[in-house]
A protein has these predicted regions:
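Extracellular glycan-modifying ectodomains
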Residues: 1-397, 401-409, 418-496
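Hydrophobic beta-strand positions in extracellular immunoglobulin-like domains
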Residues: 412-414
Length: 496
């Protein structure tokens, strides 16, 4: 019995030591993700009593990224996929007919609220107006998640895991169409029948070559008005190593993919004089995998990935060149977070860069103090000292110049740490509760002290009334000054 116990203990010790031993003798597996660094292994945080989460994460990756650990993961996933025909990890879940879906894209089944959708869509239009004021055509495009295009391929388990995802997808698209959103939704060209060629890979998170082509044809129409018609015919086939098996499950897998080289060279020739010029494209992986095709459509475009380590500097440099087009793409699962809290928010790299570029252009506007009959103060009381005391929800309504691109400058001092908001007027108030809406607005600094905001808007806003909320409740504004003016129009006034 003692001998058996010793053998059991020895086997268990070998089982525990094998991953670490293989790591020491063989190093990290080449396929390992989030590999352990020397800095992490020597960090004082490993000895911090209250940092158990850090130690657990390092230990888990130390074992799982070892050759033995990786082999165990591969074997387990290969057994699930190829023998049992079903896998369910933190990142991948099986659908019907061998399809795989990316679980983080389901966002834990959370629902998008109508309020958040409205704010999100309004913010995109506000970005578009800030860009238009400085002569830039800003467009945002959305690449639909695979489960949104192919919900019929989810199967029972994946369908249950999606939770509210499909309903939320339908809801935001319905609201976008009702509000006449400028978003280029690639879902609009992803319609299909059961017998149609696939637009996405069965086991990849991305669209395939046919899906890319449909999306790019849509871009051409949206940005130029030129419609690219005709059947898209394949000219060959290649094998494609798909990302979910290879990168996430760590098992080898390839999927057949149709190629369309003849169609591309005929429809989008390299020497075409119809290429879209002067374009800055900020993108994630969907446009990343479409890079070669996009170069057939755009003339020397400037591509920048969200993952670029110098993204803030690169975005500012790109806008400093005053491109004619700025095209920003996001995959649907990241859309809400990128717009409201990420790169496209007013504190994000793109939103802030647009505000700064707009303010720089507005600095060339000839300003004068706004006429008294062009100003209206609400919940703001002027004191004998000249200061203003703000109550709850103070507002300043500013009548903009009647012609050209209206400019406004607002400066004041305050001791409170509350953001300044500028609400853009809504000309078409269909489905709105008034001339201003939370999303169709700019969020500016909340820093105490002197504030000085410059803004130039498109000629669409000439003669309209801008709403400025200097702070949102209770405080003093000193040295308040409001100036207005105008810059020449770029083009005849268009309808909003």
């Amino acid at each position: 019995m003692k001998l058996a116990n010793l053998a059991t203990i020895g086997a268990f010790a070998v089982f525990l030591a094998a991953p670490v031993g293989s790591l020491v003798t063989m190093g990290l597996d080449p396929a390992a993700e989030r590999a352990i660094t020397l800095t992490e292994l020597t960090s004082a945080k490993l000895l911090t009593p209250n940092d158990e989460k850090y130690r657990n994460d390092v230990a888990r990756r130390l074992v799982s990224n070892s050759p033995v650990g990786m082999d165990a993961i591969r074997a387990k996933n290969a057994l699930d996929v190829k023998v049992f025909g079903f896998v369910n990890t933190s990142q991948v879940i099986s659908g019907a007919d061998g399809w795989l879906f990316y679980k983080p894209g389901f966002q834990n089944g959370a629902c998008m609220s109508e309020h958040d959708i409205g704010v999100m869509l309004g913010h995109v239009e506000a970005l578009r107006m800030i860009a238009k004021g400085i002569g830039i055509d800003f467009r945002m495009s959305v690449s639909p998640d695979k489960e949104v295009v192919y919900p019929e391929k989810l199967g029972p388990a994946a369908a249950a895991a999606t939770g509210c995802k499909i309903l939320s997808s339908r809801l935001w698209r319905r609201i976008a169409k009702t509000s006449k959103s400028s978003i280029i939704d690639h879902f609009d060209v992803m319609g299909h029948d059961v017998t149609d060629d696939l637009l996405y890979f069965r086991t990849d998170t991305h669209w395939n070559e046919l899906g890319k082509l449909k999306a790019v044809r849509q871009l051409v129409f949206e940005l130029t008005g030129r419609k690219v018609d005709g059947p898209i015919l394949a000219s060959g086939q290649v094998m494609h190593a798909t990302d979910m098996p290879n990168r996430l499950l760590r098992i080898d897998h390839e999927e057949a993919e149709e190629t369309y080289d003849d169609y591309v060279s005929r429809t989008f020739p390299d020497d075409s004089n119809q290429k879209i010029a002067d374009t800055f494209i900020l993108h994630d992986s969907f446009y990343g995998v479409s890079y070669d095709l996009l170069k057939h459509v755009f003339l020397n475009p400037l591509f920048l990935s969200y993952g670029n380590e110098n993204i803030e500097l690169e975005v500012r440099n790109a806008l400093a060149k005053s491109p004619k087009h700025v095209l920003v793409n996001t995959v649907e699962r990241n859309m809400l977070s990128k717009i409201l809290h990420g790169e496209m928010s007013w504190t994000g790299v793109l939103g802030k860069a647009f505000l700064d570029a707009n303010a720089k252009t507005a600095g060339g506007c000839k300003m004068s103090d706004a006429a008294k009959d062009g100003l209206k103060f609400e919940n703001l009381s002027k004191q004998p000292s000249g200061d203003f005391t703000a109550g709850v929800d103070p507002q300043i309504l500013v009548r903009l110049a009647e012609h050209g691109r209206p400019c406004v400058r607002i400066s004041f001092e305050t001791a409170v740490r509350q953001n300044t908001y500028v609400y853009l007027p809504i000309k078409d108030q269909v489905n709105q509760n008034g001339p201003y809406f939370e999303g169709f607005s700019l969020m500016l600094t909340d820093a105490p002290g002197a504030r000085d905001f410059w803004l130039v808007l498109p000629e669409d806003f000439a003669g309209m009334t801008l709403r400025v909320d200097p702070i949102y409740s209770t405080g003093t504004l000193s040295h308040l000054r409001i100036q207005t003016g105008a810059l020449p129009s770029f083009s005849p006034v268009s309808n909003m």
